[in-house]
Curated annotation (Swiss-Prot):
Its main location: cytoplasm. A lipid is attached at residue 2 (N-myristoyl glycine). Residues 473-716 are annotated as: Kinase-interacting sequence (KIS). InterPro entries: AMPK1_CBM, ASC_dom, ASC_dom_sf, CRP1_MDG1_kinase, Ig-like_fold, Ig_E-set. GO terms for biological process: signal transduction. Phosphorylated by SNF1 in vitro. CDD domains: E_set_AMPKbeta_like_N. It holds the Pfam family AMPK1_CBM. Gene3D superfamilies: 6.20.250.60, Immunoglobulins. This is SNF1 protein kinase subunit beta-1. The keyword Phosphoprotein applies. GO terms for molecular function: protein kinase binding. PANTHER family: 5'-AMP-ACTIVATED PROTEIN KINASE , BETA SUBUNIT, SNF1 PROTEIN KINASE SUBUNIT BETA-1. The gene is SIP1.
Length: 815
């Protein structure tokens, strides 16, 4: 396919026939095929067939006509040939033959080391050689052989654009070395053409086209050299190449380049200016490098940002705040908040600023949280020192005042109007004029708006010495206090509080009142359960509402209602049990007056009074507690609800009214009723029970003895007389049903014992009829209700008879 053979046939070198250049070109075209390489002995056969065709037919194949159209001045390599007269006119970039060798070996071996010469053909002339026994393997195709030589290194090729070797040197070199330069030339030709067409200086510098000489007319082709990608500026200001395949590119050099402001842009992104395929792994590597770069930038400038924002907030300078907001918006003169590469990519491509605003908000929240933690830690240190100085004084003031707490003045919090919506609640100073509540000054206003001061005391045993260890054991209170510490303390203190979480709260002994109490206990609204630990023994107090837990143990409980400043839970029943129970005529103690402000002033002012310490908590649907005296509590709640929750109204006791009249339902006799009214002297003596009067109260033996009249009437007759006067209702349905009796009879017949009578009723009652209330129809103005139970293998049926005057009432209504 364009390669001149290294050996010439002597029969054709001396004799030049007409049209021999077409045949030589055809043979030359066939020598580069797979058939010519595998079967070298068939070359003479091809030549003879070509000459025979030209002599007899005089026709030129189409491929020969194509070759004849060129100028026969040069050969395929662009130089004059002494062997042939066929030349090519214009030079071509692509060669026809890319085979590694065009000449056969001395021993006529092919590329596959195969020969087709037989034993009897050795030494014979070429004309007498028989055609080989193997047929052609297929159509002519180019032979390609893989090589291990590296074409990426331009230094080994010295940027050779044109093969400038002499003719002798080219003939001396092997075939694959003589034509290797054509590939390099084509590559550089393509790169130069693209470089000249592109006006961008960055594109020409990226391919190193400036260092290459000018292109001239060449007969060679080239393949672009694959160079390792490095960080190179692109046409976009925010895009760089992060896809680096060079393993020698260390991370230290990467950091050095990023530190240089001249070579690194702050808006480095993932998109690349080079035309290349981005698969999932390459994209993940690029994003990972972006995140590492941003993390290094954040760590290096986090301290600077925190100090700057803290300084701006402490001074309260509005200009600094506006400048910080402008810097967060994207100013290049000052330090800006780090923005992820994904957010910048979305902004550049689609104009979407959602991700950028989210990154800015996260950065602002992070810096303000760090500032608030520092402020809380400083305020906590001041609060602890202040509380240690005033705790004793406040405790004495509470004890001496007898818990008559005075209302506080309205709070005046100091609020910074320049705080954004992402800022955490700041510490607010509280001005107060009462020494009794000095301990409250150590609590921030955010907690004081939700929490209530709870006074818990132990009053049961006054003989407990001051040296006794008394604790309150409550997981509910401990969890509430833990949440308060997490809100007020910094991060390190909150971690310590989690480790030291203990449901035990120590109580302090009061020498004046001889009781134990818990100082400074502020709790949010809710229901709390607790127990008292006296020298390690868990017990409950009788002065607090009691309940039972899931295990059946007695516990105390109380409820904190919102809107109150101070409460002291205790049970009013304990005080009433210690005194003499009052009679119905005596007036019950009045409920203490409540000094409460209108609901509209809750947000601005708070109060505390003795009356707020409720003797009993209003009823609430707390299912985990079985409260004592729940009926009284429910009644009081209903009364309060009926009076529009007027807590100032006095609770009036209800008087019970008794009567000596017997209801008609229980009157059994001749219909005469006895009503006892007034004094006992007015009551007439009652007749003894008899057959005609109060038969229910009669003794059975006496009753039947009277009916038999001293033995004149037998027992059966007396029973018939009694049933005629007082008829007994029928049996329950399961004992007086023909259907059930028939089923029982069938079961008895199928049983093993056939000696029983057919009419016998099985005494075993179906279990579906047990513990069920059964009744019969109303007959003779009497209704009966029965229930059957099983007891130790026996069945017990209890029947209750009751009169029912349904017909009488119906007749009266009709009349």
């Amino acid at each position: 396919m364009g390669n001149s053979p290294s050996t010439q046939d002597p029969s054709h070198s001396t004799k030049k026939e007409h049209g021999h250049h077409f045949h030589d070109a055809f043979n030359k075209d066939r020598q580069g095929s797979i058939t010519s390489q595998l079967f070298n002995n068939r070359k003479s056969t091809h030549k003879r067939r070509a000459s025979h065709t030209s002599e007899h037919n005089g026709a030129i194949p189409p491929r020969m006509q194509l070759l004849a159209s060129h100028d026969p001045s040069t050969d395929c390599d662009g130089r004059m040939s002494s062997d042939t007269t066929i030349d090519k006119g214009p030079s071509h970039l692509f060669k026809k033959d890319y085979s590694l060798s065009s000449a056969a070996d001395v021993n006529d071996t092919t590329l596959a080391n195969l020969t087709l010469s037989d034993d009897h053909d050795v030494g014979a002339p070429e004309e007498q050689v028989k055609s080989p026994s193997f047929l052609s393997p297929g159509p002519s195709m180019a032979t390609v052989k893989q090589t291990k030589s590296d074409l990426d290194d331009l230094s080994t090729l010295n940027y050779t654009m044109v093969d400038e070797t002499t003719e002798n040197e080219r003939n001396d070199k092997p075939h694959h070395e003589r034509h290797r330069s054509s590939i390099i030339a084509l590559k550089k030709n393509l790169l130069e053409s693209s470089a000249t067409a592109s006006p961008s200086p960055t594109r020409s510098s990226s391919v190193h086209s400036a260092s290459l000489p000018a292109l001239t007319k060449t007969d060679s082709i080239d393949i672009p050299v694959r160079q390792p990608y490095s960080k190179k500026p692109s046409i976009h200001a925010y895009q760089y190449q992060y896809l680096n395949n060079d393993e020698t590119f260390s991370e230290n050099s990467q950091m050095d380049k990023e530190g240089n402001s001249d070579s690194v842009d702050a808006e480095a992104g993932v998109l690349q200016s080079e035309d290349m395929v981005l698969n999932q792994s390459l994209l993940q590597n690029a994003l990972k490098k972006d995140m590492q770069r941003l993390s290094r930038v954040n760590s290096s400038n986090s301290m600077y940002t925190t100090e700057r924002i803290s300084h701006a907030n402490n001074n309260g300078n509005i200009e600094n705040n506006t400048r910080n907001k402008g810097n967060a918006g994207g100013s290049n003169d000052d330090f800006t908040a780090p923005i992820s590469a994904t957010a910048k990519m979305m902004m550049k491509l689609y104009g979407d600023k959602t991700l950028m605003e989210r990154d800015l908000n996260k950065h602002q929240n992070k810096t303000k949280k760090a500032q608030n933690k520092k402020i809380r830690s400083a305020s906590n240190s001041r609060r602890s020192s202040f509380a240690s100085l005033h705790s004793l004084q406040s405790r004495k003031s509470i004890l001496t005042n007898g818990l008559n707490l005075q209302p506080l003045h309205p709070l005046h919090p100091i609020i910074n109007d320049n705080e954004s919506q992402y800022s955490a609640p700041q510490h607010r100073e509280i001005s107060h004029h009462s020494n009794s509540m000095s301990s409250m000054s150590s609590i921030s206003s955010t907690n004081s708006t939700e929490n209530t001061l709870v006074v818990l005391k132990w009053k049961d045993d006054g003989t407990v010495a001051a040296t006794t260890e008394v604790f309150i054991v409550s997981t509910d209170i401990a969890s509430a206090l833990k949440e308060q510490r997490e809100l007020t303390l910094d991060e390190n203190a909150s971690l310590d509080s989690e480790k030291q979480l203990n449901p035990r709260i120590r109580m302090v002994y009061d020498d004046v009142h001889k009781e134990w109490f818990v100082p400074d206990l502020f709790l949010p609204a809710g229901i709390y359960r607790l127990q008292f630990s006296i020298n390690g023994i868990l017990t409950h107090s009788n002065f607090l509402p009691t309940a039972t837990d899931s295990e059946g143990n007695f516990v105390n409980w109380f409820e904190v209602l919102p809107g109150y400043h101070t409460i002291e839970p205790f049970r009013n029943e304990a005080d009433m049990d210690s005194q003499v129970e009052p009679t119905l005529d005596e007036e019950l103690p009045k409920r203490p007056e409540l000094k409460r402000f209108p609901s509209s002033s809750r947000k601005s002012s708070y109060y505390s009074a003795k009356g707020v310490e409720r003797p009993s908590t209003p009823f609430s649907d707390y299912r985990g507690l079985s409260r004592s005296s729940s009926i009284n509590m429910r009644d009081s709640f209903v009364r309060l609800k009926a009076s529009s929750l007027d807590l100032m109204a006095e609770v009036k006791p209800e008087r019970l009214v008794y009567s000596n009249e017997i209801p008609n339902l229980f009157n059994i006799g001749d219909g005469s009723t006895i009503s006892v009214k007034g004094d006992s002297d007015d009551v007439h003596p009652q007749e003894p029970p008899s057959f005609t009067h109060r038969v229910v109260d009669c003794n059975q033996d006496d009753l039947f003895a009277t009916l038999q009249q001293g033995g004149n009437i037998d027992a059966e007759t007396a029973e018939a007389v009694f049933l005629s006067r007082y008829p007994v209702p029928d049996l329950p349905i399961y004992l007086n049903s023909s259907y059930l009796n028939r089923i029982l009879n069938q079961s008895n017949q199928n049983s093993e014992s056939h000696e029983r009578d057919e009419g016998a009723i099985n005494h075993i009652i179906p279990h579906v009829n047990l513990n069920h209330l059964l009744t019969s129809s109303i007959r003779d103005e009497i209704i009966s209700v029965a229930c059957t139970t099983r007891y130790e293998g026996k069945f017990i049926t209890q029947v209750v008879y009751a009169p029912c005057y349904y017909k009488t009432q119906k007749s009266q209504i009709s009349n």
